[in-house]
Design a protein with these regions (language model features):
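P-loop NTPase motor catalytic core
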Residues: 1-173
Length: 173
């Protein structure tokens, strides 16, 4: 990818690889030193990733593309304004390398199209969700990070194949 996708996913300097590496580095450095005579206090961090494609009005799970479960945006409760996507799969990962492998596998199913300026312009938005749950003997802390790669900004008229009603026209008339 080029442009926005390269900025988000570039192998060594993309925002997503940098964010995942920084996250796991921080989680690893949070482990307190344990005196030899003491047993370490149970402390764990669970990290999971989800990857959603938004194409027009359609939501697709890029980590479980063959799933028949329809994805829908839902509100958590009447008193909570939090939105979530029901049916979206989530995969637990142990380190940044594993997370990036999962993300790259999912992105292979992302819709792309050749344009005059870019051989593989994304035609959909991709939303990476990273859930972190850190537990020690006194508390559980949950955090969530969203990283979004927007669809290519080329207008449909710049596409080599711009059939009427193509998904690219939904975003880029």
């Amino acid at each position: 990818g080029a442009g926005k996708t390269h900025t988000m996913l570039g192998e060594s300097d993309g925002i997503i690889p940098k964010a995942l590496n920084a996250l796991f580095d921080k989680l690893g450095s949070d482990e307190p030193p344990t005196p030899v005579a003491q047993t370490p206090a149970p402390r764990a961090a669970k990290v999971s990733v989800s990857l959603l494609q938004i194409l027009g009005e359609k939501l697709e799970d890029l980590l479980s593309p063959s799933s028949d479960v329809p994805l829908r945006v839902r509100q958590a409760s009447r008193v909570n304004d939090e939105l979530y996507v029901s049916g979206l799969s989530s995969i637990v990962v142990d380190d940044a390398e594993a997370a990036l492998k999962v993300v790259n596998r999912g992105l292979k199913g992302r819709r792309e199209r050749s344009t005059k300026r870019n051989d593989a312009s994304s035609r959909s938005h991709a939303v990476l969700r990273v859930d972190i749950e850190k537990t020690d003997d006194c508390e559980v802390v949950k955090s969530r990070l969203y990283l979004v790669d927007l669809a290519g900004s080329e207008r449909a008229s710049a596409l080599d194949d711009d059939a009427e009603g193509s998904p690219s026209k939904m975003y880029n008339p």
